[in-house]
Amino acid sequence: MSLCEAPVHVGDKELKYFQIPQMLSQLSLLASHHSRGLEFSGGQGESRILRVKVVSGIDLAKKDIFGASDPYVKLSLYVADENRELALVQTKTIKKTLNPKWNEEFYFRVNPSNHRLLFEVFDENRLTRDDFLGQVDVPLSHLPTEDPTMERPYTFKDFLLRPRSHKSRVKGFLRLKMAYMPKNGGQDEENSEQRDDMEHGWEVVDSNDSASQHQEELPPPPLPPGWEEKVDNLGRTYYVNHNNRSTQWHRPSLMDVSSESDNNIRQINQEAAHRRFRSRRHISEDLEPEASEGGGEGPEPWETISEEMNMAGDSLSLALPPPPASPVSRTSPQELSEEVSRRLQITPDSNGEQFSSLIQREPSSRLRSCSVTDTVAEQAHLPPPSTPTRRARSSTVTGGEEPTPSVAYVHTTPGLPSGWEERKDAKGRTYYVNHNNRTTTWTRPIMQLAEDGASGSATNSNNHLVEPQIRRPRSLSSPTVTLSAPLEGAKDSPIRRAVKDTLSNPQSPQPSPYNSPKPQHKVTQSFLPPGWEMRIAPNGRPFFIDHNTKTTTWEDPRLKFPVHMRSKASLNPNDLGPLPPGWEERIHLDGRTFYIDHNSKITQWEDPRLQNPAITGPAVPYSREFKQKYDYFRKKLKKPADIPNRFEMKLHRNNIFEESYRRIMSVKRPDVLKARLWIEFESEKGLDYGGVAREWFFLLSKEMFNPYYGLFEYSATDNYTLQINPNSGLCNEDHLSYFTFIGRVAGLAVFHGKLLDGFFIRPFYKMMLGKQITLNDMESVDSEYYNSLKWILENDPTELDLMFCIDEENFGQTYQVDLKPNGSEIMVTNENKREYIDLVIQWRFVNRVQKQMNAFLEGFTELLPIDLIKIFDENELELLMCGLGDVDVNDWRQHSIYKNGYCPNHPVIQWFWKAVLLMDAEKRIRLLQFVTGTSRVPMNGFAELYGSNGPQLFTIEQWGSPEKLPRAHTCFNRLDLPPYETFEDLREKLLMAVENAQGFEGVD
């Protein structure tokens, strides 16, 4: 038992597992030697002795791969205001349990007003850094005091374990007992150990604390009928709905079930499955919700520390504001529009040079697009920065936002709103200065602007957009300008040159979009972050140069977005922000809006704000080598001559898995499956020219790969990447027959040019190709296991006492598996550690699932020769089977054709692509499935879309009246689009058709 007094410091926070006991003994010894006579230096105020007893842990998260965790608790006393650590101690380690019992006591001399205690639970790992199991941050100002005169029952409190960052996976409670020692006139320290021998508990005098304890100890509500709670082999709790044969991560409640019908529940689960497989890029950064902790606890600032979120967007740190401190599940469209506006404002000059030096000198300056000439910029005199204002549609923040001092004086010209001043430039032209938000404009402000001027440009000078003058510019890179101090001092800066080039001829005649050439798809350096430049390699491949760090990369920096920006809702067309510099928006004589690029002197109908890669999606990486392999592969696939013309299946949607299994496995001659597929759904009228078959593959994929059936399970790192369940035989006695069926379905998909809707771990594809699985393949599947093996590879593992065997846990029982004959008697040394690592990888990915994989390959090779598949590598095989998950709208638009009166410049077509660009990633995938029958894109993009008669580009055909909804022909990749009269009408009915369409009634 030790008394830890401030200041006691531990220098090395990254302790190895063999250093911790030694440091702990030194810390305890130091604290006990100085327990008397040490002047308290932890802060101002009265100090008291706090007794802390770490009782136990309840239902901790499972971190070990082969069994339960080895938890211990680290206690840190720190100053709340300064975040400075004063003392650090820890408990002993309890082996192989998720409900450890420590029953260890510690004494701290604390200042209740400004000290806090941080309890961190870790899983001891002999190979790598200890795993984090959760933390509790406790303020010390409201803890009870022991009363030695009363009969004291043993009291405690269960604290909910909290995550340290948004990626932490924690669960369970930490049971603690904390109270101050009674004040006995300086005898506290001397008698503390004597009192401890006699005391067995004390009374909590805070009634609120007891009430909160009672509330937290209540058991969770019972599960609804038909639900079951289970724990997978990774220790994650999930819930099984036996009513509709589905699984989910969150705990259901009786209220949720009673409020919705079975059909609604099934639909919700299906939509969740759609998002899980389609939005691979968003779910992988899925933010784990943090449960709220009751009991009147104070704020826990440790939860806001998130290094992952800070590192996610470091390449854009100069152009973006800091990420939010806490995880965000949804963001308002206004915030998204501001983010898009900030990205659209970062534009290089004509030479591709960024003005990063200007931004670095003044990171908090606000740069807006300029709409005055260089002469006006030199002569415009601006007062000191004004008070903080709301960001308007035309504002762009470069760097972090900082509040500015209030304005000292305001010049107001009679007849103008408050804060506005009329001036003339050197050429005698009149312009107007808004001292409220430090902007200038050529347009004379009207009096209605007075009430908006001081409060912050909520409408700013964009109000003149509503004036009914067809030929006057509506917006020229936003008709306002912010002249910051660095801009005035830059004689020949890139911004000044851009301003000069933008408005060298402000009175240019209005061009007609009808006569202007169609914009060419050329390489552009627009929207690159500051300090970045794009160049073309000799082989024609673009690469990017970061002049800030003097590095080059093939990856487009514009596609690296913070985590909280990757799952956004659909954009609102009114929240897109200002136009890029040098662009102007005008209205044609027929009322349509078009855009002028004064930089390249071209006009177009497309809104340039919607061409940002952040909105359109990543470009499709064309692979010439893959194309050649695929053409060779298709050429070698021969259809037998002595088979029927087509293979027919008539199925029910609600029983598609079992019916497909019985029908396909009843075929004794696999060559029959190479005939043309003809799928019909019961009670639906649809001719299958390819579209219904794609729908069948999509629906069947969701059922085959559903972990509910026990054939597959999620990998250790996420809940969407699949791997074979090594215990599938315990879930289904006929599991090998089902794996043969799944192999046949996969072979059918590849043979007929269709795609599966599922993602497997990379070793799965390597096993199909018969390739050796390496340690690097482990990293993407199980990072913790990878780090452990990596540590063994880089260090001498002799001191770990490892043997050539592995402990495997199945349903609570632990079995020892020898990696080689008599492996339990062979020690891992520095000489044989590579053999040990290879055997562990072989056991982890191959040996446990060898029977299942052989059955899968048996069905797969019945339709496709394995030698022909081996011309692809594992990455190409994944694309061959599953396609691409992202939708590049620019590529989609470029490879589309129009019929029956539609053309690329038709207003309805312009509105259609605008609606697609304003959709979020999920809605684009659903639109793609609506028009093609699948949610996957071929390897080389939309140029290789296939229809019923071979290659068939996406087609939009004019059809019907404006009152009708759009309809799709998935067999021909065609969308019948009525000639709607407004953009809002088109967008509403397109979304209605996409979100509510199911089946093939009346549509082939």
Swiss-Prot record:
Q: What is its main location?
A: cytoplasm
Q: Where is the active site?
A: 971 (glycyl thioester intermediate)
Q: Which domain of life is it from?
A: Eukaryota
Protein name according to UniProt: E3 ubiquitin-protein ligase NEDD4-like
Compartments reported by the entry: Cytoplasm; Golgi apparatus; Endosome, Multivesicular body
Impact reported for residue 477 to A: Strongly reduces phosphorylation by SGK1
Entry annotated with the keyword Phosphoprotein: yes
Q: Which InterPro entries match?
A: C2_dom, C2_domain_sf, E3_ub_ligase_SMURF1, E3_ubiq-protein_ligase, HECT_dom, Hect_E3_ubiquitin_ligase, WW_dom, WW_dom_sf
The annotated modulation of its activity is: Activated by NDFIP1- and NDFIP2-binding.
Quaternary organization: Interacts with UBE2E3. Interacts with NDFIP1; this interaction activates the E3 ubiquitin-protein ligase. Interacts with NDFIP2; this interaction activates the E3 ubiquitin-protein ligase. Interacts (via WW domains) with SCN1A. Interacts (via WW domains) with SCN2A. Interacts (via WW domains) with SCN3A. Interacts (via WW domains) with SCN5A. Interacts (via WW domains) with SCN8A. Interacts (via WW domains) with SCN9A. Interacts (via WW domains) with SCN10A. Interacts (via WW domains) with CLCN5. Interacts with SMAD2. Interacts with SMAD3. Interacts with SMAD6. Interacts with SMAD7.
Q: Which residue range or ranges hold the C2 domain?
A: 30-154
The segment(s) forming the WW domain are 221-254, 414-447, 526-559, 577-610
Give the classification, highest ranks: Eukaryota, Metazoa, Chordata, Craniata, Vertebrata
Quote the pathway field: Protein modification; protein ubiquitination
What gene name is listed for this protein?
Answer: Nedd4l
Which function does this protein serve? E3 ubiquitin-protein ligase that mediates the polyubiquitination of lysine and cysteine residues on target proteins and is thereby implicated in the regulation of various signaling pathways including autophagy, innate immunity or DNA repair. Inhibits TGF-beta signaling by triggering SMAD2 and TGFBR1 ubiquitination and proteasome-dependent degradation. Downregulates autophagy and cell growth by ubiquitinating and reducing cellular ULK1 or ASCT2 levels.
Q: How is it modified after translation?
A: Phosphorylated; which impairs interaction with SCNN. Interaction with YWHAH inhibits dephosphorylation. Aldosterone induces Ser-477 phosphorylation by SGK1.
Mark the residues carrying the PTM Phosphothreonine: 347, 396
Tissues in which the protein is found? Highly expressed in liver and kidney. Also expressed in heart, brain and lung. Isoform 1 is expressed in kidney, lung and gut. Isoform 3 is ubiquitously expressed.
Pfam families named among the record's database cross-references: C2 (PF00168), HECT (PF00632), WW (PF00397)
Q: Which residues form the HECT domain?
A: 669-1003
Any one GO BP annotation for this protein: regulation of sodium ion transport
